C-alpha cells in the first residue's frame, strides 16, 4: 500500500500521513469470524491499572485468526484482503475446499484468487504453511510456532520476517527480526513470506486525536508529576531526577536494566543474542 500525504490545511493535518488502503478488496468482515471485544482500558480483574496509557478509542470486533494453519492438504482460495483494527498487519479471508472459512495474516504478495495450502508436502510459495524442517535455507518466513500445534507466536507484525539459516538435528536455526538467532523445533510450523503492510511504520499520525482513536492515552513524564506520584517528581521548575539513575514510577531502575529472567530455560535455544555483533 502507498502512503497518502495530506496538505497542511490545518495544524492537525500538517505532516499527517496515512495508508491509501488500495490493497483492501472489501470493508465488510466475515460475520461468522467476528467476536465481541470488551474494552479493558488497561485494567485487570480487580479494576487496577496494569498497563498504563490505554483507554477510550473506537469500539472494535475481534477477528478470529487461524494462527495454527493445521488443515493439511486442503486447498484454500483467497477471497478478500481486509483491514484488522486489532493488529498492524492486514488479514486475508480464505475459503477452504471443504467449506470452512478462516482469516490468516496476509503476507506480502498474496492476491485474491490465489490458492494456498498447509502441510509437510506444501510447495515453497507465499502463503503456504509447513514445518520448519521442510523449508529450504534462506527462505523468509513469518507466523512461527514455538511449540508444535500451539499456533504461530513469532513474527506476526506488519513488515516482519525471519530467515531460515539451517538445520541442526531436530532443531531449525532461525534469524529473527531483532537479529537474534534461535533454535526452534523443526516440527513447528511457519508460513512462507514476509508479513504485508510493510509501510505501516512510516505513517505519521499528525495529531494527538488519532492516537486517542486507537485507544492510546497520553504518556506523562515523571519529572512533571508531584513527588507522591513519581520518584522524578517535585522540585522547583525543571528539576533534575535527583537520583543516581532514572527510576520507574514504582522506584525500580529504568533505562538499561536487563529484565530477562537469568534462569530462563529457553536460554539454551538462543544461539546469538540480538545485541551481539
UniProtKB/Swiss-Prot annotation:
Gene Ontology biological process terms in this record: cytoplasmic translation
Keywords, ordered alphabetically: Ribonucleoprotein, Ribosomal protein, RNA-binding, rRNA-binding
Record's compositionally biased regions (Basic and acidic residues): 264-277
Organism domain of life: Bacteria
Chain residue ranges for the region called Disordered: 219-277
Family per record: Belongs to the universal ribosomal protein uL2 family.
Originating species: Streptococcus sanguinis (strain SK36)
GO cellular component terms given for this protein: large ribosomal subunit
Keyword RNA-binding tagged: yes
Protein's name in the database: Large ribosomal subunit protein uL2
MF-aspect GO terms: rRNA binding; structural constituent of ribosome; transferase activity
Subunit structure: Part of the 50S ribosomal subunit. Forms a bridge to the 30S subunit in the 70S ribosome.
Amino acid at each position: 500500500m502507498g502512503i497518502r500525504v495530506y496538505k497542511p490545511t490545518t495544524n492537525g493535518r500538517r505532516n499527517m500521513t496515512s495508508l491509501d488502503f488500495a490493497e483492501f478488496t472489501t470493508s465488510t468482515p466475515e460475520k461468522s469470524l467476528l467476536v465481541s471485544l470488551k474494552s479493558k482500558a488497561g485494567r485487570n480483574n480487580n479494576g487496577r491499572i496494569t498497563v498504563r496509557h490505554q483507554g477510550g478509542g473506537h469500539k472494535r470486533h475481534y477477528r478470529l485468526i487461524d494462527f495454527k494453519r493445521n488443515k493439511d492438504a486442503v486447498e484454500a482460495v483467497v477471497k478478500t484482503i481486509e483491514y484488522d483494527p486489532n493488529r498492524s498487519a492486514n488479514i486475508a479471508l480464505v475459503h477452504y475446499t471443504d467449506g470452512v472459512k478462516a482469516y490468516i495474516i496476509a503476507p506480502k504478495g498474496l492476491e485474491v484468487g490465489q490458492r494456498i495450502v498447509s502441510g509437510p508436502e506444501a510447495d515453497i510459495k507465499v502463503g503456504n504453511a509447513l514445518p520448519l524442517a521442510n523449508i529450504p535455507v534462506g527462505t523468509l518466513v513469518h507466523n512461527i510456532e514455538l511449540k508444535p500445534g500451539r499456533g504461530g507466536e513469532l513474527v506476526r507484525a506488519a513488515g516482519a520476517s525471519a530467515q531460515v539459516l539451517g538445520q541442526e538435528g531436530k532443531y531449525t536455526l532461525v534469524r529473527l527480526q531483532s537479529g537474534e538467532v534461535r533454535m526452534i523445533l523443526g516440527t513447528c510450523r511457519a508460513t512462507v513470506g514476509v508479513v504485508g503492510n510493510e509501510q505501516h511504520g512510516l505513517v505519521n499520525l499528525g495529531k494527538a486525536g488519532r492516537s486517542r482513536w486507537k485507544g492510546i492515552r497520553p504518556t506523562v513524564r515523571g519529572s512533571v508529576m508531584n513527588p507522591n506520584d513519581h520518584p522524578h517528581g517535585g522540585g522547583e521548575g525543571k528539576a533534575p531526577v535527583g537520583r543516581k539513575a532514572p527510576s520507574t514510577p514504582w522506584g525500580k531502575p529504568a533505562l538499561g536494566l536487563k529484565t530477562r529472567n537469568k534462569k530462563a530455560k529457553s536460554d539454551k535455544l538462543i544461539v546469538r543474542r540480538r545485541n551481539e555483533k
